[in-house]
Design a protein with these regions (language model features):
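N-terminal positive-inside, membrane-proximal cytosolic segments immediately preceding the first
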Residues: 1-34
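Short extracytoplasmic
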Residues: 58-91
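Short, charge-rich, low-complexity alpha-helical interaction segments
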Residues: 28-30, 51, 58, 133, ...
Length: 208
């Protein structure tokens, strides 16, 4: 009889974990995307100030008002200066993810991540986002490999990489690895309160 209750408890715990990730997954993506866009906007605005590329700013803003933002940004990319061109690529990837075209979104972020002309900060953000929007049938080990450097190197993306990596570990059925990542996240300073609370909750739910 005890075995039956243990199985029920495990099923409930698994359902709770799935519900938490369903609830927070989109929020995580939105938060990271917002950070990337804000930083990129700052770079784009600085470029506009120094080069007086007002036409680039107008072209970008006009594309955002289009019924087909992706097509408009793709068509107008040649008019954009470096800062706005990068921002456009991030926007294209975000639009693709919003349209549930996760394969295209992942490819767009990977293109940014491999662009050596970009500041490493943006390359790292793109690499993280490529994992977060990857299709459900993507190979977990390959996704985890993209996060390995971000999880260990101090920087603005480390906490988010650890949280994302913990989710991948859960998908792979490796509860111990997931708990270890959540604990590392909890030990970090300056972790957003919401993220810390999620990590704490997951540690409790995973029974550690």
């Amino acid at each position: 009889m005890a075995d039956i209750f243990d199985e029920i408890d495990e099923d409930l715990k698994r359902d709770q974990i799935q519900m938490l990730w369903a609830r927070y997954g989109k929020i995580v993506i939105a938060v990271v995307a917002a950070i990337v866009l804000l930083v990129a906007l700052r770079q784009g605005y600085t470029a506009w100030q120094t080069s007086q590329s007002e036409a680039s700013a107008r072209a970008y803003q006009q594309a955002l008002k289009s019924d087909d933002v992706v097509a408009a940004l793709e068509a107008g990319r040649g008019q954009l200066t470096d800062g706005y061109a990068m921002l456009a690529q991030f926007q294209i990837a975000a639009e693709q993810a919003a349209a549930d075209d996760f394969t295209a979104a992942e490819a767009s972020y990977l293109a940014l991540a491999s662009d050596a002309s970009l500041d490493p900060l943006y390359q790292q953000a793109a690499s993280l986002l490529s994992v977060m929007v990857a299709p459900q049938d993507a190979e977990v080990a390959a996704l985890a490999a993209r996060l390995s450097d971000l999880e260990t190197a101090a920087g603005p993306w480390q906490a988010m990489a650890l949280e994302t990596g913990a989710g991948l570990a859960l998908r792979a059925g490796n509860t111990d690895a997931a708990v270890a990542k959540y604990k590392r996240l909890m030990d970090m300073a300056d972790v957003p309160a919401g993220m810390r609370k999620r990590a704490e909750r997951m540690i409790v739910m995973l029974g550690d």
